[in-house]
């Protein structure tokens, strides 16, 4: 199921004293992987949190599932960056938006945040625009919960780099070092189509991330 391509090329880019990896044609059978990951709607993420805007102005759905077939993929990525997996679970994101002034993507960025270490994202839409941004925070403000007020003013952030999406492309970057978030630049996902990806999380053992 999760066999990697035999002949992919690992692109390694030095960026701000770190490395970003891009691997096109990551999976050998990406359509099969896609159908397995997204055959059903995943549960709404953190829907128990109050207050929440999830399932009110947008749908943030995530799958958490044990699948031993994924272990070799996670181990490969772990060795690539010398970081320990945060989890061996299969993880996906499915996101779409409702048409409402709340979703002001023209003036706001979606939830810039840090994670525990390196992040791997495999994109599963035929889309070359709505990828992942890396930011510099110009104005530091109190963070609210992700699902209550996820949109942040563009005046508070500078985009340092956009990681362009492509079907079956893996992007792999240090999510602890770099503030980052989903890049939404048009209304493509304001209908029935979900923005879909698979994610991997790792932990920088030199940092105490809680």
Residue ranges: model-predicted function:
Residues 1, 5-7, 120, 157:
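Intrinsically disordered, low-complexity regions
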Residues 2-99, 103-110:
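Non-heme Fe(II)/2-oxoglutarate
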Residues 100-210:
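Catalytic core of non-heme Fe(II) oxygenases with the double-stranded beta-helix
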């Amino acid at each position: 199921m999760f066999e990697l391509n035999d002949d992919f090329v690992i692109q390694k880019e030095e960026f701000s004293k770190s490395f970003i990896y891009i691997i096109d044609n990551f999976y050998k059978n990406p359509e099969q992987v896609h159908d397995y990951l997204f055959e059903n709607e995943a549960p709404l993420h953190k829907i128990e949190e109050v207050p929440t805007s999830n399932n009110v102005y947008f749908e943030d759905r995530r799958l958490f599932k044990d699948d031993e077939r994924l272990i070799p993929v996670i181990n490969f990525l772990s060795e690539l960056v010398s970081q320990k997996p945060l989890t061996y679970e299969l993880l996906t994101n499915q996101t779409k938006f409702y048409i409402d002034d709340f979703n002001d993507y023209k003036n706001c960025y979606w939830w810039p945040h840090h994670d525990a270490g390196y992040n791997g994202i495999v994109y599963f839409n035929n889309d070359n625009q709505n990828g992942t941004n890396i930011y510099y925070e110009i104005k530091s403000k109190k963070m609210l919960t992700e699902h209550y007020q996820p949109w942040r003013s563009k005046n508070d952030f500078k985009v340092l780099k956009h990681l362009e999406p492509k079907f079956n492309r893996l992007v792999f970057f240090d999510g602890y070092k770099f503030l980052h978030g989903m890049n939404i630049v048009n209304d493509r996902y304001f209908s029935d189509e979900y923005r879909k990806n698979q994610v991997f999380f790792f932990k920088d053992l030199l940092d105490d991330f809680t």
